[in-house]
Amino acid sequence: MAYITKRGNSFGVRYTYEDEHGKSCDKWESFPTKEEAVKRQKQIEHELATGTFLIPSTVTVAEFLMDWLPKQCSKHKWAPKTYESNLSTIQNLIIPYIGDMEMQKLRPYHMENLYTTLSKTPCGSYIEGKKQELGEKQKRRTLSGTTIHEVHRLLGTAFQYAVEWGIIIKSPVPVDSPKKSTQERTIWTVDEMRAALDSMEDPVLHLAVHLTLVGALREGEIVGLTPDDIDFDAADGIGTFHINKSMQRVRKEALNQVDDGCIIKIFPDKLERSTTSLILKSTKTASSCRTIFMTSALKEELKKWLGQMAADETKDPERYRDSGMLFRLPNGLAIEPVLIRKKFLKWQDAHPEFPRIVFHGLRHSSATYQLMISGGDVKVVQGTTGHATADMLVNTYAHIQQSSRVELGKKFEEGFYVKPGTPSPQAVPAEGEPTISVSALVELLKNADPEVKAQLRLALLT
């Protein structure tokens, strides 16, 4: 029951409820008029009778999220990087702005204000929850729409749990999410890929890039390879390498929170008091486990690389530290993803004639090229790239390159301007040009024997 008591010039509503621990609690709420007090009295009695009463709580957004995060990690068996990414979002993009607000006082307009603030916030304003001093150039680079969309997604999920846990009645997260950034990534053409590979003299970088272009690998998958993943005799001597592991450097805090079932190996720390660990883990999804067919050039390079590894071990066996990885330093220690990225950046600085791309752009370029040479066979290319769904592959990686658009324009001109009853003009090939068009060749290959398709693909990638 709820009772109304006049207290001076106001009216108080007194009621008793049980908290989340079953303890009986008394609560007073004050109102300026009796009408408001009566309205609140009826609301409380109805909610207590129907079990919809919201227990008063002063839990803040920061307190709730830091309680929710490890529970979600344990429930869904997150990988270390997933936990680390979500923790970073909470610490750097949410808590500094709405962390001190009480959950029960949060409203949709607070969320809209958060998104507006983030859209004007420079990248890196907070690191591990600590305010950073940024230079003028850094201040001009603000958070992307994709990043703000991720904040919206995380809060949407978290606040639904707050509703289930009885902390709030309704989620304050707006239905409409902030728009993602749609800027297309820069990729290389096949000529640029080939020329870039030819210009790379660093054997570590050359092999890493070669593997990426053939198999559309992720950075962690490249350095996550081990010698026993390679089979030179598989597929009737074509040779294959198997992708089932990934290497990452993660914060030790994340390792303490996640299920270690996905972790294959934790490498020894190189520095004392390191706050991060280098780990080898199973790939993030079942579809990421895949077998890649070698090209003859890649096969020879891998054989040469393994031969050099054996030679390095015999030079100084006492100091050699066999990490068990395919990519390793001359002393046997594992090469981690950041070193590959640094080598690639150094190469790019020395070769400004190539379009500037991030290392992951090589995977992007490879997937796009393979879609082109396969005649758009998404399922076949998906088997190589390891995307969880075909839609993800098409939406993320399928670029229409300039050469394809030019060809499309020519076909439009040939067909659109022909008058009824007039035979279509046939292009006469110049001397030395093939007498079959690319489109006709693609149609023939679609119905070709699978073995012929595989041989042609290997020839094009060699």
Model-derived segments and their meaning:
Residues D229-G237, G375-A398, S424:
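Short, polar N-cap/turn motifs at the start of nucleic acid-interacting alpha helices
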Residues G124-I127, D198, D202-P203, G215, ...:
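Short, basic (Lys/Arg/His-rich) helix/loop patches that form interaction surfaces
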Residues K179-K180, I187, K245-R249, T385-K411, ...:
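Catalytic-site neighborhood detector that most strongly recognizes the C-terminal catalytic loop/helix
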Residues F232-A235, K245-C289, L298, K410-T462:
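C-terminal secondary-structure termini that scaffold catalytic or DNA-interacting sites
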Residues I127-G145, H149-V151, E164-P227, A235-I238, ...:
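Basic, Lys/Arg- and aromatic-enriched nucleic-acid-binding interface segment
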Residues Y3, Y17, P70-E164, T182, ...:
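N-terminal core-binding DNA-recognition domain of tyrosine site-specific recombinases/integrases
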Residues M1-P32, T240, N244-S274:
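Short, Arg/Lys-rich segments that mark the N-terminal edge of DNA/RNA- and chromatin-recognition modules
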Residues R7-N113, E128, G307-D322, Q402, ...:
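N-terminal DNA-binding module of tyrosine recombinases/phage integrases
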